[in-house]
Amino acid sequence: MIVRLKKVPQSFDGIESLNAVIEQEYLDFYHDPVPVERTLRGRHTEDMNHASEYAKKRWDDYSDDEDKKSRDAYILGNYMRAYPPIKCTSITLGKQTYSKYVEGDINYKHIFQRVYNLPLKDNYMLSFLFKYRLEGEESKKKFRKWLLSSDEAFEHKVLETLEISRLVDPQLNAISAK
């Protein structure tokens, strides 16, 4: 698990608005029409442009249904291996409500992650990242069943055991009260 303190560019006033902010930030970053070299910014756009160019060269001259199916399967596979839009959901674990999203599809990628974001204040959130890497087909088969249920079997239990409290210095409270 990786824990990050993150600041989002827009203000939010609850978990539902945080969900919308995270989804838009993700889309703006990975789907940026102008990819930035040596970063992941615009990576989905770049990957899909390459996939479309290849599919056009490979299958545009053929018009039968089998070729169209092959082309569509190729493009769908590339879409799922890139960075398709995410969908955030609200989930309450213990005393906290998180904005949760899944990145990656185990059927298409060897990296899969679930991210739980806990809103703090002033556009800040704590981001808990559970990242999984699958190596080889055998490990994928063995690990797949566990991975698909790990959000409830493992991640939720970890997050429920966290004790998160506001850090308040009693000296600062005494000064501000005077």
Language model feature labels by segment:
Residues 2, 6-11, 16-17, 24-25, ...:
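Short, well-structured beta-strand
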Residues 70-73:
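Low-complexity intrinsically disordered segments
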